[in-house]
Curated annotation (Swiss-Prot):
GO molecular function: cinnamyl-alcohol dehydrogenase activity; coniferyl-alcohol dehydrogenase activity; zinc ion binding
InterPro entries referenced in this protein's UniProt entry, alphabetically: ADH-like_C, ADH-like_N, ADH_Zn_CS, CAD-like, GroES-like_sf, NAD(P)-bd_dom_sf, PKS_ER
Gene name linked to the record: CAD1
Function: Involved in lignin biosynthesis. Catalyzes the final step specific for the production of lignin monomers. Catalyzes the NADPH-dependent reduction of coniferaldehyde, 5-hydroxyconiferaldehyde, sinapaldehyde, 4-coumaraldehyde and caffeyl aldehyde to their respective alcohols.
Name recorded for this polypeptide: Probable cinnamyl alcohol dehydrogenase
Highest classification ranks of the organism: Eukaryota, Viridiplantae, Streptophyta, Embryophyta, Tracheophyta
Length: 355
């Protein structure tokens, strides 16, 4: 084993400016310490939030930026205090790679809500080095922010790491895990299609809600949804009033909330998971008169991610993906912006030429 104190270099694909165009970029990895893993990246999913970051949609981007937070890799080296992982293990890591370890969320296994969390890219680590993501040959991650990938789950299924736990966590936290509930999925993209699969596996009746009819066959026949509702169909929306216990709103652009609040039963929950950098509006009687809630949820903890992966393994759930090489990544990002993917791009990093 080599020295864990030495710096290493790796090559990733980085955005240099808000154009969001990625190209090869060689940089130093942060020093690895006693609790760290040095990981060879095998594959990395592409999430819509990656587009927000590389194009500076949120006004917080720093360049050069190597995106990618749905990462599966092979452990090449472990620090002296690493206890859960060994060289050769297949592991996954996500969007959070650091936290304060002392606040309420950290002490209750909800580190993704720590106010001092460190993002896996477009942030600065405790040693002052910029963090960079999974569109790269290697990464260094602390053992607290890594999970073991179950045997039988393909490495390319790393999209489950983000999309899967984004729906699994709120279903568990909001007491919506029991069978027999009626749920809605607004938006049939990467998160939405996993929402259908996970909710169905929990025994829920699932309605997909979309702006057009073009995904009806896919939703009902391929993903197993029970019903399909077009939001512009006034009669259909009216008939569905007060019919759902919850709705996952995965839409990442500004849209009205009131039509969907009307679909919720008494005490129903509208759960926001799409990143929107603009105000959303509704009139208060829409929630008051049905004791309804508009809430949000952000990915899931590492503990919940482990639970979700085991749940997916047990139920045989996988993400529907399109595997690409790194030299196609810019085209894939353009297609993702147009919603032209079913339902998640995954980069075969280990099989790609990076330089």
């Amino acid at each position: 084993m080599g020295s864990l104190e030495k710096e290493r270099t790796t090559t990733g694909w980085a955005a240099r400016d808000p154009s969001g165009v990625l190209s090869p970029y060689t940089y130093s990895l942060r020093n690895t310490g006693p609790e760290d893993l040095y990981i060879k990246v095998l594959s990395c999913g592409i999430c819509h939030s990656d587009i927000h970051q590389i194009k500076n949609d949120l006004g917080m981007s720093h360049y050069p930026m190597v995106p990618g937070h749905e990462v599966v890799g092979e452990v090449l080296e472990v620090g002296s205090e690493v206890t859960k992982y060994r060289v050769g293990d297949r592991v996954g890591t996500g969007i959070v790679v650091g936290c304060c370890r002392s606040c309420g969320p950290c002490n209750s296994d909800q580190e993704q809500y720590c106010n001092k969390k460190i993002w896996n890219y477009n942030d600065v680590y405790t040693d002052g080095k910029p963090t960079q993501g999974g569109f790269a040959g290697e990464i260094v991650v602390g053992q607290r922010f890594v999970v073991k990938i179950p045997d039988g789950l393909e490495s390319e299924q790393d999209a489950v790491m983000c999309a899967g736990v984004t729906v699994y966590s709120p279903l568990v936290r909001f007491g919506l895990k029991q069978s027999g509930l009626r749920g809605g999925i607004l938006g049939l993209g990467g998160v939405g299609h996993m929402g259908v699969k996970i909710a169905k596996a929990m025994g829920h009746h699932v309605t997909v809600i979309s702006s057009s009819d073009k995904k009806r066959t896919e939703a009902l026949e391929h993903l197993g949804a029970d019903a399909y509702l077009v939001s512009s169909d006034e009669n259909g929306m009216k008939e569905a009033t007060d019919s759902l216990d919850y709705i996952f709103d995965t839409i990442p652009v500004v849209h009205p909330l009131e039509p969907y609040l009307a679909l919720l039963k008494l005490d129903g929950k509208l759960i926001l998971t799409g990143v929107i950098n603009a105000p959303l509006q509704f009139i208060s009687p829409m929630v008051m008169l049905g004791r309804k809630s508009i809430t949000g949820s952000f990915i899931g903890s590492m503990k919940e991610t482990e639970e979700m992966l085991e749940f997916c393994k047990e139920k045989g759930l996988t993400s529907q993906i399109e595997v690409i090489k790194m030299d196609y990544v810019n085209t894939a990002l353009e297609r993702l912006e147009k919603n032209d993917v079913r339902y998640r791009f995954v980069v075969d990093v280990a099989g790609s030429k990076l330089d």
